[in-house]
A protein has these predicted regions:
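Short, locally clustered residues in the helix-turn-helix/winged-helix DNA-binding domain
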Residues: 200-204, 246
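Hydrophobic residues on short alpha-helical segments
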Residues: 199-200, 230
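PAS-family sensory domain signal
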Residues: 20-76, 169-178, 183-184
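The N-cap/first-turn positions of alpha helices
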Residues: 194-198
Length: 251
């Protein structure tokens, strides 16, 4: 069974103690609190040097029946308690490989990167699949990730995994293969404006007939746009399409 050491990779450990300026950390926490107030997503700040949560929002999606303070107290033991063992092993492997990939970028580029994955959280007999996204906030003087922000929402997938590593402004991204234990570089996705409009209107709850009327196109044409959007995004449902388009910042 994995332990906490698997979540904190030695290659990301700073040799020197970061500058724990209380004003900076207080500003970070207040910013995270403000963001948590206006989003449906769970939000947390992780301190990789002290190996603890700096902040955890009170969104019940992430808490698994605990209070935010209880989760802060548990730290990454929370994952050992509430992530199924098979998913824990997946996360440990992902941590090792993702920190290695992060390390390939310089300090400025690291802060433009984010990673998205899907895994289960369990609370007693109840289990839910979440989407987890993580990006650096502060780096140490050595360029190691010191403070990171995590964002949690319900997954649009049916299974765990589906890992993607993105760098803002890049025309490529990487997906992780747990079968091959490697990152695979992929070309960025682009959609035509008509395809994006179909996704936007579908997300708003409009039917194919209503979308056709709004866009002054036939229903068959709307279905054509939707099918091409699905093919480009590699998905099979409108929920997955909207989620993937959002992740890739296409809207």
């Amino acid at each position: 069974m994995p332990d906490m050491k698997g979540f904190f990779i030695s290659s990301n450990m700073a040799c020197n103690v970061p500058d724990y300026n209380p004003d900076v950390l207080s500003t970070l926490t207040r910013t995270a609190e403000a963001f948590a107030r206006v989003t449906y997503q769970g939000v947390y700040l992780i301190d990789y040097y002290r190996q603890e949560f700096l902040y955890v929002s009170d969104n019940p999606l992430f808490l698994c029946g605990h209070t935010a303070e209880e989760v802060r107290g548990l730290g990454y033991r929370f994952y050992l308690k509430h992530v199924p063992e098979t998913d824990q092993k997946m996360l440990v492997e992902l941590n090792r490989s993702s920190f290695k990939l992060f390390g390939a970028f310089d300090a400025a580029a690291k802060c433009q990167c984010y990673i998205s994955s899907h895994f289960h959280l369990s609370n007693g007999t109840k289990r839910k699949l979440i989407n987890h996204q993580l990006t650096p906030v502060l780096l140490t003087d050595e360029g190691k990730i010191w403070i990171g922000v995590g964002i949690v929402s319900l997954s649009s997938h049916r299974t765990a995994g589906h890992v993607e590593f993105h760098r803002r402004g890049s025309g490529t991204y990487w997906t992780y293969s747990f079968e091959g234990h490697q990152w695979n570089e992929c070309s960025g996705v682009s959609l035509k404006e008509e395809e994006l409009e179909v996704l936007r209107l579908s997300a708003a709850g409009l039917t194919m007939v209503e979308i056709a009327g709004r866009m002054c196109r036939s229903v068959d044409t709307i279905k054509f746009y939707r099918r091409h959007a699905f093919d480009k995004l590699g998905v099979a449902s409108i929920t997955e399409a909207v989620s993937r388009a959002t992740l890739n910042k296409l809207f």
